[in-house]
Amino acid sequence: MHSLLRAAQIARVARPGVKRAMTPAVRFYSDKKTEKSDQPFQSSLLNDDLLAQAGMDVDESKGKSKPAAEGKSEGAAEGATEDDVTDEQRARWAGTAKKSTDQTSKQESRERIAGYGYYAFFAGSAAFAAYLARDWDNEEDKKKHDTIGQGYTPMLMWARLKARIGDTFSFYRDPVAPVLLPDPPAPPYQRPLTLVIALDDLLVHQEWSREHGWRVAKRPGVDYFLGYLGQYYEIVLFSSQYMANCEKLIMKLDPYHAWFSHVLTREHTTYEDGKLVKDLSLMNRDMGKIIIIDPDTGCTMKQPENSIPIEPWKGTPGDKELVKLIPFLEWLVSQNVNDVRPILKAFDGTYLPDEFTRREAIAREKFEKDWYAKHGKDGQWASKFLGVSEPKQQKPLMPHDVMRREGQKQYQKFLEYLAVEGPKLKAEEERMIAEQKAMGPKNLSEAVSSIGSLPPVPQQPTEPKA
C-alpha cells in the first residue's frame, strides 16, 4: 500500500503541465465537431512503468477483471469496446444483468409487504361492501327502509349499501331522541301555543377579541319578552350550541326556571346538507300551534311556514326589534286560532312588526267607529234631564288590549314574587344538588364498582314498643 501511494506521488510530480489552447468560449451548432482521438484512453495515471517501479507485478494486475458493478463481462473487460459487442451478445446478457437500484433488500421487502397489504385492504373493503349490500335480515330494517326492497340487482344493492352506511353515521346526524318534548300538560295548565326561540343572535350575542376574550351581550328587552309572553306561550329555548357550552348562559337568563318550559340544544338538531336543522315535527306538538323565531334561516328550512323571520342581532345597543314582536304575538294568542301557518303566510314578504301595526290601526279605527255608533248617544238624555255635564267617554278597548292590561299586572306581581321567593327557591335547588352529589360515588373506583349493583334497600321504620 505504501508503494502505491509513493508511485502516485511520483506520477503527480513527474506529470508535465498541459497548456490549454486559447479557444473561444462560444461554439456554434454549425461548427464541426472534432474527431475522436485514435489514441487509447488512459483511465489511470498508474501506468505499467510506475507500477513496476513500485514493485508491483504488472502481468498479474492486467489479468484481473473489472468489478461486476461496471456492467461489463469478463470478455469485454480485456479490451473489447461497446461497439465490438454484437446484438446476439446483448440479447444473451440481457437476462443476466442485474437491475441497478439504490434500494436495499429491507426496503424491497417492505414495499412487497405493503403491496400485499393494499391487496388485502381492497379485497376486505369489497367483501365488507358486499356484506352491507345484502338483503334486509330483520323486520326493523325492513320497516325503517320500506322504500328499498329485496333482491340483488345493482340498484337495490347500492341502495341498501348507502342505507346501512347512513345508519352507521346516524349518531352524528340524527337527534338524541325521536321525540324531543314530553307530552303536553292537561288542558287547564296547557298553553294554547308553543313558541320556539333561538339563543345566539336573538337573545344574546357572543363575540371574541384578543383584548377581552369571550364576551356575551344580552339583547335589550329580553327579560320583559320572556317574562310577559311566558304567561301565554309554552316557551322552548332551542340553541345551536352544545349543552356543555351554553348551560351557564341559560342559567343566567333564567336563574329560577320561570321563563323556559323546555330547553333543547345542538344534541337535538338534525344535520342535513351541511346545516343544522331544528325539526319541529319531532316536538310532540300540533304543527299548527308552533311558532319558531330564529335568525338562522337554515335552522328553519324544514318548516319555513312556522317561522317568523328576524335579522340577527350583532350587539347593537338600544335595539327594539325583539320587543316589537310582542304586540303581534299577544294578538295571535288572543284569537284562539287552530292553525297559525295561514296567518304567518299572510305576512310573508313584509316586515312583520310594521305591517301588523298598520293593519291593527285599520282594524282599531273600524272597531272604534262601530262602537261609537252603537254606544255614542247612550246616557245623553239622562244627563240633559238632570242638568249635569256628560261624562267623558274613554276609548273602547279591543280584546287584546284588555289582555295586555291584565297581563302586565300579572307580570309585575310575578316579578315581586320572584324578588321574595326566588333566592329561597335557588337555595333549595342547590341543597338538592348537593344531596345528589353526596349520594353518588366519590371517586372513579366507586363508580366502576357500583355498575350493575342494585340500589340499597331503604330501612323500614320500626314500630314503637307499647
UniProtKB/Swiss-Prot annotation:
Gene3D superfamilies: HAD superfamily/HAD-like (3.40.50.1000). It comes from the Eukaryota. Keywords: Membrane, Mitochondrion, Mitochondrion inner membrane, Protein transport, Transit peptide, Translocation, Transmembrane, Transmembrane helix, Transport. The chain crosses the membrane at residues 113-133. The keyword Endoplasmic reticulum does not apply. GO terms for biological process: protein import into mitochondrial matrix. Residues 52-109, 436-466 are annotated as: Disordered. Residues 1-29 form a transit peptide. It is a single-pass membrane protein. One of its GO terms (cellular component) is TIM23 mitochondrial import inner membrane translocase complex. It is found in: Mitochondrion inner membrane. SUPFAM superfamilies: HAD-like. Residues 188-332 form the FCP1 homology domain. PANTHER family: DULLARD PROTEIN PHOSPHATASE. Essential component of the TIM23 complex, a complex that mediates the translocation of transit peptide-containing proteins across the mitochondrial inner membrane. Required to direct preproteins in transit and direct them to the channel protein TIM23, and possibly facilitates transfer of the translocating proteins from the TOM complex to the TIM23 complex. This is Mitochondrial import inner membrane translocase subunit TIM50. The gene is TIM50.
